[in-house]
Design a protein with these regions (language model features):
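Catalytic activation segment of kinase domains across protein kinase-like and atypical kinase folds
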Residues: 138-179
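Secondary-structure capping and boundary motifs in well-ordered enzyme cores
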Residues: 20, 45, 127-132, 159, ...
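Conserved ATP-binding subdomain of kinase catalytic cores across diverse folds
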Residues: 1-83, 160-163, 174, 179-186, ...
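Helix-rich C-terminal or lid/interface subdomains of diverse kinases
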Residues: 80, 196, 200-231
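A structural signal for well-ordered alpha-helices, especially hydrophobic packing surfaces
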Residues: 57-60, 86, 111, 115, ...
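ATP-dependent phospho-/nucleotidyl transfer catalytic cores
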Residues: 31-49, 62-132, 137, 141-151, ...
C-alpha cells in the first residue's frame, strides 16, 4: 500500500544488512509519484501534515508502546535535559558561562515547566504512546498530483513517548514564521493561524484515539519541545 513503508528483505531474509564496518542498512520499496517538502507553504499543507501525523497516532493507539526499544534513551525527558544544562553551567569547562547568563536565566525561570508532562506520565494521567519523534514536514510524502499526504517516513526514531512530544515538535517548526536556523530573532514569531491549521488536521485524525488529558496538554508539548531544543 502507498500509505505504508515496506521494508525489503535481504538475501538471507533479514530486515536489515550489517556491512563489514558494523553499519546497519535497510531498504524500503519506493513509493511512486510522491515528493517531500522542507516547509509548508500554506495553512492547507500544514493541516495535511497534521492529519498525517494524527493518523499515525490513531493507527498505533492500541500498540503496546512499552514493548518498543528506546532508540535514544531520555530523548524528550525535558527535566533530564534541564539537569544536564545545569550541571554543564556549574562546570563551565569552556569558560563561556558569562556569555550566556541571559539565556540561562530564561531557562531557569521556566524550570517548573520542564517536568509537567513527565509528572503526568509518572502519575498515569497520560498514556505511553508510540511516537515518531521527528515530526517535521520533510518526513511526510505527498502525492505529486493531488497534494494529499500519502505516507509518514523516517521511522528510525519511533519509540515510546507522549503524543504531546510529536504534536509539539511539529508546532515548534510548523507554526514558526521563520526557518529553524534563523539568526535574526525579530523574524521569529508564533503563527496562531498555522497552529490552528495543524491542530485541526491532527485532531481530525487522532482526536477519538486520545484521552481528554492528552488533548488538553498538546499545547504544553509545543511549549516544552521549543524550550527543550533551546536547552
Amino acid at each position: 500500500a502507498r500509505g505504508t513503508l515496506t521494508v525489503l528483505k535481504t538475501a538471507d531474509g533479514a530486515d536489515y544488512y550489517v556491512d563489514s564496518s558494523g553499519q546497519y542498512w535497510r531498504a524500503t520499496l519506493h513509493i511512486p509519484d510522491t515528493t517531500a517538502f522542507e516547509t509548508a507553504d500554506s495553512d492547507e499543507m500544514l493541516m495535511k501534515s497534521g492529519a498525517a501525523f494524527g493518523a499515525f497516532q490513531r493507527m498505533l493507539a492500541d500498540y503496546p508502546a512499552d514493548t518498543l526499544h528506546e532508540t535514544i534513551p531520555h530523548f524528550h525527558d525535558t527535566p533530564a535535559r534541564y539537569r544536564q544544562l545545569a550541571e554543564a553551567a556549574l562546570r563551565d569547562e569552556a569558560g563561556r558561562l558569562r556569555e550566556v547568563t541571559a539565556e540561562l536565566r530564561f531557562v531557569n525561570d521556566r524550570k517548573a515547566d520542564c517536568a509537567v508532562l513527565m509528572d503526568l506520565l509518572e502519575k498515569d494521567r497520560l498514556p505511553l504512546r508510540v511516537t515518531h519523534n521527528d515530526t517535521k514536514m520533510s518526513n511526510i510524502l505527498f502525492d505529486r498530483r493531488t497534494g494529499a499526504a500519502v505516507c509518514v517516513i523516517d521511522l528510525d526514531t519511533v519509540m515510546p513517548g507522549l503524543t504531546a512530544f510529536d504534536f509539539g515538535d511539529s508546532i515548534r517548526t510548523g507554526a514558526s514564521t521563520a526557518a529553524e536556523d534563523e539568526t535574526d530573532l525579530s523574524k521569529v514569531h508564533f503563527s496562531l493561524d498555522r497552529f490552528r491549521a495543524y491542530t485541526a488536521g491532527f485532531l481530525g485524525e487522532a482526536g477519538d484515539a486520545l484521552t481528554e488529558t492528552e488533548i488538553r496538554t498538546l499545547p504544553v508539548g509545543a511549549k516544552l519541545m521549543t524550550l527543550e531544543v533551546g536547552i
